[in-house]
Amino acid sequence: MKNLQFSPLSRALALALPLCLAACSKAPETAAAAPTTPATPASASAQAHAGIDWVKPDGASLDAIFAKAKADNKPVFLYWGAVWCPPCNQIKATVFNRPDFIAKSKAFVPVYLDGDTPGAQKLGTQFKVRGYPTTILFKPDGTELTRLPGEVDAVQYMQLLAQGLSSTQPIKETLAQALAKDAGAAPTLTMDAWRMLAYYSWETDESQLVPKKELAATLLQLAQKCPATYADTAARLMLKAAALSAEEKAAGLDTAAALAAVQSVVKDPVRARANADMLSYYAKDIVKVVTPKGSPERNALVADWNAALEKLVVDATLSKGDQLGAAQAKVDLTAIDGPADPKQPRDATLLTLVRDTAAAMDKSITDKYERQSVIPNAAHLLSDVGLLDESDAMLKAELPKAVSPYYHMLVLSSNAKKRGDTAGALDWAEKAYAGSIGPATRMQW
């Protein structure tokens, strides 16, 4: 999502709608049939995750919540999201409903902050959160420990949550140790410490640790400094450095080293699975920055990347949204050197993959939060390969049961725009605006 402010999950971090790819905080590009009544932020969140004792701020202050956490010696888990946001609903459907997350939530104070509730935007400014979703861990005294990545799979998320809760050192101090010029100035970092750096939610950092313009260079330094014994972690850091170098158009990336790291991931099924989020949500960015256009190296890398993605599309250990993300990445890679010629027919095998994947998502997903996350992206996937009528049909069938149907209307508006139907695009966009809920959402529309 370039137009939406999604945090990878901001792609996730948030598959690719010209709407979505990396962080939900602005409304999508355009959009859908008679409006239905969407759930309000309050009612939707009240229905969700009954096993979690969510604490909701009363106004624009968390002082009382942090004071009680300190008195009870409990860390604080802060969730910042929105009812309509696909990546937020992905976390609800794959993480917050897990029995182990619900059980673990008894050990911390879970704070639920919806961006459309009174005072939320002021709190967002205070805690430096913008992209939806953002999840932050704080020590009982209110010190920020780390920001967790929303784009990783649920098992990885739970592992990182456990590591974050067991840590006594803020990630800011860990970063300073990792970058220290004098290796003897600080204790050697553990494997878990390096892993927390590699999986830190850099996309939602909001310059808390590193100024945005220095982020790609910092990740490159981390990749180079990471001990050889932690090769998997070093490879992920290099993937992150490459992705952010592409996004920020930053100079200084060692493309040869980055290409070698990328190849070590895409050619290894275990590493590829561990970095499924990177392969799905940053495919074009990374390939473009580590290989020259039209080069044999690019052609070989795209072939290897596609082979890895084909395994991820059918990997039952991934969520439906992540499987769909892999299919979207395959489509994205077809336009690696420029948009496809609309006059040329699409590859039949790719069309079959897209149709089958979208249909499987629609048929198999029953959880309403997961549907809010996946169905708009499945519809976008269809429209991205020119199947606009099939995309429209999926979206219109979903409107009566969607958590936030106005989001789906934006995709319908986008489809109409692609057809050259200006009146239809405006009509769906107006319906989406009329049906939207929440002051922040409506302001950003």
Regions flagged by a language model, labelled:
Residues 24-28:
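Bacterial signal peptide processing site
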Residues 54-59, 80-81, 98-120:
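Thiol-based oxidoreductase modules, predominantly thioredoxin-like and allied folds used
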Residues 56-75:
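A short beta-strand-turn-helix
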Residues 80-96:
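Conserved redox-active cysteine motifs that mediate thiol-disulfide chemistry
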Residues 130-171:
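Non-catalytic, surface beta->alpha helical segment in thiol-disulfide oxidoreductase systems
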Residues 167-172, 206-218, 249-263, 294-311, ...:
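Helix-turn-helix repeat elements of alpha-solenoid scaffolds
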Residues 180-185, 220-228, 263-273, 308-321, ...:
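Solenoid-like repeat scaffolds
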Residues 186-193, 229-240, 270-283, 317-338, ...:
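Generic helix N-cap/helix-start motif at coil->alpha-helix transitions
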